[in-house]
Amino acid sequence: MAPHLLHVFSTFKLGGPQRRFVQLANAFGPSYRHSIIALDGQTQASSLLSSDVEAQFLTFQPVKGRLRPVANLRAIWRLLSEQSPDLLLTYNWGAMEWTLANRFWGFAPELHFEDGFGPEEADGRQLARRVWTRRLAIGGRSGLIVPSRNLATIAGETWRIAVENTHFVPNGIEVERFAGAAAGRCAIDGGVVVGTVCALRPEKNLGRLIRCFSQLRDLPVTLQIAGDGPERLPLEWLVRELGLADRIQFLGHIDDAAPVYAGFDIFALSSDTEQMPYSVLEAMAAGLPIVATDVGDVHTMLSPDYKSSSVVPVKDEDGFTEKLRQLVRSPSGRQAVGAANQQFVRQHYSLERMVDCYNRLFQRAIDRGKHNRLPAAMAQTAA
């Protein structure tokens, strides 16, 4: 029987961690069985799973109130005992209670993923409570997986996670799917399309992108924003306030982003915090030049030949605007930078490389866990 993997997400709405899981599950096919918990009950990303993926969604209702910590830990222990997974995989801060529960009782070998930070830690300052919780929870039995060198450094220097327990695995992508969709790219009515793809959340700081775009009124350029989220209404209000409603389009939620990238001429990333954003890899695969804030590993992801023309300090809106302006004015420049980005992502960020790396990590953790599992009687007592 295929090994049983239990995945715990704060949400299974489509985002970077969910997109990566879908890629891996589809690539693994029937090699693993998956049980998935979305703590908020949202499971929209499940529609992207292939038919040969054996996956079930489990319900878990976190307890709220004064007795929450003890009640939740007991409920987690009970579910882990019932499911008896060969490997527990927990994703980001929202699943940290599960890592804590498994830390002390060792129901299953575990790999914990950290993909980045929300707006409360976007400025690089770590919240002390979270630092200590991560040290305690991840620092025991769990292996830690991070997609960026920046996070690997934080894990060692701030969270004090042992180097041998920290695994840096860059995200990978189906390059040809995006390259093929973009092969027929052509200008729309002679104009240039700047685009971005992201969840409309505060840390994405799309207000910055809109303000920078507003300085390009003298050029034949439009802006397309693909994605949805809580910031949409404030952003639409900002667009109207700046008198840009006829030049900025909100595309809403997108299931298949490849055709969307094919309609862009330039990709823009205006985030306050990222680590290794999938959107940048997708834009590179689509052969796009990129203007981005210098967050996470973005400066190492892009073609080294054009980093200086692509990345600006986070708060440098004038610099961001100027790099957009230069690319809008230069069709040959866009083509050269986009081609270099596409070649670089092919060489360094293939899906095949990522899948192979994760398969080896999963198998190693499962094999190690066979010798270190909590005895069934103790598991029942804990639950």
What is the predicted function of each stretch?
Residues 90-96, 114:
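Short His-centered aromatic/hydrophobic patch
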Residues 150, 172:
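Carbohydrate-associated surface elements
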Residues 304-318, 326-331:
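Conserved acidic donor-binding segment of nucleotide-sugar-dependent glycosyltransferases
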Residues 253, 272:
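Aromatic "clamp/platform" in nucleotide-sugar-dependent glycosyltransferases that forms part
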Residues 31-34, 206, 210-250:
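A conserved nucleotide-sugar
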Residues 15-23, 192, 196-215, 230-237, ...:
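A conserved mid-protein helix/loop that constitutes part of the nucleotide-sugar donor-binding site
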Residues 7-15, 19-68, 229-230:
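N-terminal strand-loop element at the rim of the active site
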Residues 289-292, 302:
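Short hydrophobic beta-strand element within catalytic cores of glycosyltransferases
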